[in-house]
Swiss-Prot record:
Keywords associated with the record: Nucleus, Repeat, Ribonucleoprotein, Ribosome biogenesis, rRNA processing, WD repeat
GO MF term set: mRNA binding
Name this polypeptide is given: Protein SOF1
GO CC terms of this entry: 90S preribosome; nucleolus; nucleoplasm; small-subunit processome
Organism: Saccharomyces cerevisiae (strain ATCC 204508 / S288c)
Gene Ontology biological process terms in this record: maturation of SSU-rRNA; maturation of SSU-rRNA from tricistronic rRNA transcript (SSU-rRNA, 5.8S rRNA, LSU-rRNA)
InterPro entries linked: G-protein_beta_WD-40_rep (IPR020472), Sof1 (IPR007287), WD40/YVTN_repeat-like_dom_sf (IPR015943), WD40_repeat_dom_sf (IPR036322), WD40_rpt (IPR001680), WD_repeat_DCAF13/WDSOF1 (IPR051733)
Compartments, record wording: Nucleus, Nucleolus
Gene: SOF1
Length: 489
């Protein structure tokens, strides 16, 4: 006689440690869970509501800010919590983002600080006593570029309560004099070269007082420039003639040029994809380009109602942040044309500078009200230490929100944002104008059969130019073609 019994092993559900939880037996057969999708939808809806409830993006401002507008911000690529800012009164401040206090400040220039960058420590490898130091380059419309030492240990005895103390010559290493006002500055990642904009692009070496060479390709005035952080010999610049020019320092010459309908205010390279870059334009949009094909943009980032003044990439390479003259900050995913987030405050004025922190968790903005503000890149995220259960719950909620993001109620709640009345009214007027233009083009295309359709990603492009060095084989082939043409004639 056989007797069937139920056998259970305590090893399957009794925890080994006191910190572990008892394992619950689960049967994953879908026939036993007919309401699984309904339960998950409810969880996704609750997670979306909680996300909007906990959305508090503003962290605080750095110190007492500046006395004038903030028009230059530079990240320290070798540190997570250090930042440099420059204002219109010529003062530069170096900040500790952890404590939100300044390390040191300099009365650097007698005019507007137009460019700022924190250099790599290898700048002065020839001098052993300067190997471990950090340096900063600043330029201004007073026709000078200055190299500063920002080694934190040298300023550790500075009185933190004296927030108005500004050093003049302390920390200054070298001054470079130019012939005209400078607009924008950036340093090479691997050597002691740096580039400045203005009437021309000048290449400098920190060990020389005069420029090593200059680059130009028909631009009226260079407004901004940026080195590629991966392909370090590639330099991109924007000009006042609505042009974007790419240079190769290995040949010391320009390679490509694109002309747009309106001026570009800022440019930034993708840190993960060395051939892609994004531009901030006067036409209220930001454009994402591939340097291998500049005849069209990869994406167009819309939603701003005024000129986009600055743009920066997240260190992960999948998001960008823009600051606009409409007094707002927007965050975009690189594969989506509309912003996922908008930040604004009542006191914040025109935003001229935005930067991501090096851990992509925070955003720093500078506006012409003199404040340097710190924001969370994800408004609902908190930086506290989380237990394993909290992490698992947050990851589970993110997957649920991703799965049900197209459901009407979840989509409505996740997209809803409170925006200032001025921006909302401007958006309504802009939408009416754009719809009117589209309707007029549709009517015109109905009567004109030869009217071409121009893609949204090509409308801003007036033309592109390539400038390549001809090899001997190319010249020989061209001569043969010319000879064949003359014979045929």
């Amino acid at each position: 006689m056989k007797i069937k019994t139920i056998k259970r092993s305590a090893d399957d559900y009794v925890p080994v440690k006191s910190t572990q939880e008892s394992q619950m037996p689960r049967n994953l057969n879908p026939e036993l869970h007919p309401f699984e999708r309904a339960r998950e939808y409810t969880k996704a809806l609750n997670a979306t509501k909680l996300e909007r409830m906990f959305a508090k993006p503003f962290v605080g401002q750095l110190g007492y800010g500046h006395r004038d507008g903030v028009y230059a911000i530079a990240k320290n690529y070798g540190s997570l919590n250090k930042l440099a800012t420059g204002s219109a009164d010529g003062v530069i401040k170096y900040w500790n983002m952890s404590t939100r206090e300044e390390f040191v400040s300099f009365k650097a220039h007698y005019g507007l600080v137009t460019g700022l960058c924190v250099t790599q420590p290898r700048f002065h490898d020839k001098k052993p006593d300067l190997k471990s130091q950090n340096f900063m380059l600043s330029c201004s419309d007073d026709k000078t570029v200055k190299l500063w030492s920002i080694n934190v240990d040298d300023y550790s005895n500075k009185n933190s309560s004296d927030n108005d103390s500004v050093t003049n010559e302390e920390g200054l290493i070298r001054t470079f004099d130019g012939e005209s006002a400078f607009q924008g500055i950036d340093s090479h990642r691997e050597n002691s070269t740096f580039a400045t904009g203005g009437a021309k692009i000048h290449l400098w070496d920190v060990n020389r007082l005069k420029p090593v060479s200059d680059l130009s390709w028909g631009a009226d005035n260079i407004t901004s420039l940026k080195f590629n952080q991966n392909e370090t010999d590639i330099l991109a610049s924007t000009g006042s003639d609505n042009s974007i020019v790419l240079y190769d320092l290995r040949t010391n010459s320009p390679t490509q040029k694109i002309v747009q309908t309106m001026r570009t205010n800022a440019i930034c390279w993708n840190p993960m994809e060395a051939f892609n870059f994004v531009t901030a334009n006067e036409d209220h949009n930001a454009y994402y380009y591939d340097m291998r094909n500049l005849s069209r943009s990869l994406n167009v980032f819309k939603d701003h109602v005024s000129a986009v003044m600055d743009v920066d990439f997240s260190p992960t390479g999948d998001e960008i942040v823009t600051g606009s003259y409409d007094k707002s900050i927007r965050i975009y995913k690189t594969n989506h044309g509309h912003s996922r987030e908008i930040y604004h405050t009542k006191r914040m004025q025109h935003v001229f500078q935005v930067k991501y922190s090096m851990d992509s968790k925070y955003i720093i903005s500078g506006s012409d009200d003199g404040n340097v503000r710190l924001w969370r890149s994800k408004a609902w995220e908190r930086s506290n230490v989380k237990t394993t259960r909290e992490k698992n719950k947050l990851e589970y909620d993110e997957k649920l929100k991703e799965r049900f993001r197209h459901m009407p109620e979840i989509k409505r709640i996740s997209r809803h944002r409170h925006v200032p009345q001025v921006i909302k009214k401007a958006q309504e007027i802009k939408n009416i104008e754009l719809s009117s233009i589209k309707r007029r083009e549709a009517n015109e295309r109905r009567t004109r059969k030869d009217m071409p359709y121009i893609s949204e990603r090509k409308k801003q492009i007036v033309g592109t130019v390539h400038k390549y060095e001809d090899s001997g084989r190319d010249r020989k082939r061209r001569k043969e073609d010319d000879k064949r043409d003359t014979q045929e004639k």
